A protein has these predicted regions:
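Caspase-like (clan CD) cysteine peptidase catalytic core
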Residues: 67-86, 90-148
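Active-site-proximal C-terminal subdomain of hydrolase catalytic domains
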Residues: 131-204
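Short, conserved loop/helix-junction motifs that constitute active-site signature segments
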Residues: 3, 7, 123-127, 174-176
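Well-ordered, non-membrane alpha-helical segments in soluble/globular domains
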Residues: 29-38, 110-120, 156-167, 203
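Boundary/activation segment at the start of structured domains
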Residues: 2-98
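A generic structural signal for alpha->beta connector loops
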Residues: 48-50, 128, 179-180
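Short strand-loop junctions, especially beta-strand C-caps/beta-turns
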Residues: 13-16, 56, 106, 138, ...
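Residue-level detector of buried hydrophobic side-chain packing
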Residues: 10, 14, 40, 83, ...
Length: 204
């Protein structure tokens, strides 16, 4: 019997907004909580454990929130940490540095990928009695992804994702030139729609 109340920390990150797998992951989240989280919480409640749930899905899912949640987590020696990710993932071409994937966390920029190994090492260092880290994602080789053992973005970066090259082009356009620009997407008597785009009349 534990001498004081202990905590089971749940950190769940689920991509429920993805165009291809979002609906499946919505169901996955329901199953995760219905058959896994709630079951474990009930079984451990009689042993003095209370659950603390950090549930990131929909618009709350982001690499920044994942990194912050991992780094800010505090626990006691008899606590339990459960990390669960459902979403897209991958690995760099010919990457032999780890067998574990990098997690997309609802976006697709390489600079924002979160290595599952980093999550494991960070949580292991917290000193809890048990750490469980599960990544329900692909681990296939992905062009454009680079090998990394830790997140490569800074702590103050926001949720607007762009590669360094994209940022440099925008900076060049806005800071290296002066003048005025007037643009239209159609000539007189023409519509703006084309190519059966789903973007709408003003974006095609």
């Amino acid at each position: 019997v534990m001498s004081q109340a202990q905590t089971i920390h749940w950190l769940t990150f689920i991509d429920t907004r993805d165009d291809r797998v979002g609906e499946v992951d919505v169901l996955g989240r329901k199953v995760l909580y219905g058959r896994y989280v709630n079951l474990i919480n009930a079984a451990l409640a009689s042993k003095g454990y209370t659950a603390k749930i950090y549930d990131y899905f929909d618009t709350r899912l982001s690499p920044e929130n994942c990194k912050a949640a991992i780094q800010n987590l505090r626990c006691q020696p008899n606590d339990i940490i459960m990390f669960y990710y459902i979403g897209h993932g991958g690995r760099a071409l010919n990457d032999n540095s780890t067998v574990y994937p990098q997690m997309c966390m609802g976006q697709s920029y390489d600079e924002k990928m979160i290595p599952l190994t980093w999550v494991y090492n960070q949580l292991k260092a917290k000193g809890a009695r048990l750490n469980v880290v599960i990544g329900m994602c692909c681990n296939s080789e992905t062009r454009g992804m680079t090998s990394k053992m830790a997140p490569s973005f800074g702590p103050n970066e926001g949720n607007t994702y762009m590669a360094n090259e994209e940022a440099a082009r925008i900076q060049e356009l806005c800071l290296n030139y002066k003048g005025n620009i007037l643009v239209t997407s159609a000539s007189p008597k023409q519509t703006s729609g084309c190519c059966e785009s789903e973007l709408g009349l003003f974006d095609t």
